[in-house]
Amino acid sequence: IWDLVDPDGVESITDVFYAVDDTCAECWDTLGVVPQLTLTDIEPGFHIFYLKIRDIAGAESSVIYFPDSANTQEPDYWKVIPVNGDILIVDDFSFDTQNNALQWFKSVFDTLGETGNYMVWELEKELPYSQADVTANLNYFKKVFWYAAYTGPELYDNASTSIEKYILNGNHFFISLAEMKDTSFTWFPIDSLVTISDIYGFSPNRVLYSQINSTLDLRTPDETGIYLDNLIGFESKDSSSFQSLYRLEFPPDDPYDPFNGIDVWDGTPNVCGVYHKQYGVGKAVLLSLPVHNGYEPLLDGNGNFSEFIRYLIDVEFESE
């Protein structure tokens, strides 16, 4: 983002010029009065964007550009990458510096034969400044699989407007999250929340019961739970648009279970559901539990998490 200034006031600026890769006399185009610019049909590879202005007296500014190697606060490269496939994996887990969660999530899609049909967007610490850029990145793909952080910052809530536009455009969206930062998602209405963990977390060897097919039941590993407090389940009363995909059953009461008495939820809370507002609009699937902690997967105790993803791709996210 660049702000235009002039000693005589911004009203004295008459022209804004931009160029890509070359600053020859014939290489400059006029930006006009629009506050932003979308570039299309750019060849894949590394590029440089140049900008300059001219005032009413005909004086031109110096040329600024991106990337600028002298600016350590910005990325030092701009690379255009061709879009491959119709699936986007969004890595919203910046604290996973070894990318263990990402490598596992990619392996799930590779196992399903989707190699070459997906791309990855690693968000790191912040989203692009413009919501238009976020929306554009999502809209290159028909299906988005977004996993939020187990611990540390996560950005999905800041992208809510773009996610809504993406779904309204007929595309499909899945998200797994550890913390429900907002319950007013317009793209996934929620009526009530249920606490399913306290300071002890969510125990190992606990089953998420599929409401579709028991072969899709998911389970936490034998020795690893989800050690986060304030995990939640959720409900939606919109029976015409909402369908539960996974519920918990009553916490087990087994004196031989080493984790007996730790789990605190009441009833059979929903932890994953699909929301489909109307024909012609895409579907949203919300899983209110994290899928990976940065060391190992958390819902693959049965070795079938990939089958759940296959179900989403082939059934829920199948084009109408």
Regions found by a protein language model. Give the residues of each.
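Hydrophobic/tyrosine-rich beta-strand signature of extracellular beta-sandwich/beta-rich modules
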Residues: 47-53
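Helical hinge/lid and interdomain linker segments adjacent to catalytic or ligand-binding clefts
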Residues: 97-192
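Extracellular ligand-binding/catalytic regions of CAZymes and related secreted enzymes
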Residues: 256-320
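Short, solvent-exposed loop/turn segments at the edges of extracellular beta-sandwich modules
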Residues: 54-63
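A glycine-rich, often tryptophan-bearing local segment used as a flexible ligand/cofactor-contacting loop or short
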Residues: 150-249, 299, 304
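Surface-exposed, short loops/turns at beta-strand junctions within beta-sandwich domains
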Residues: 39-46
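Short beta-strand segments within Ig-like beta-sandwich modules, predominantly Fibronectin type-III
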Residues: 26-34
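Solvent-exposed loop/turn segments flanking beta-strands in beta-repeat/beta-sandwich domains
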Residues: 5-22
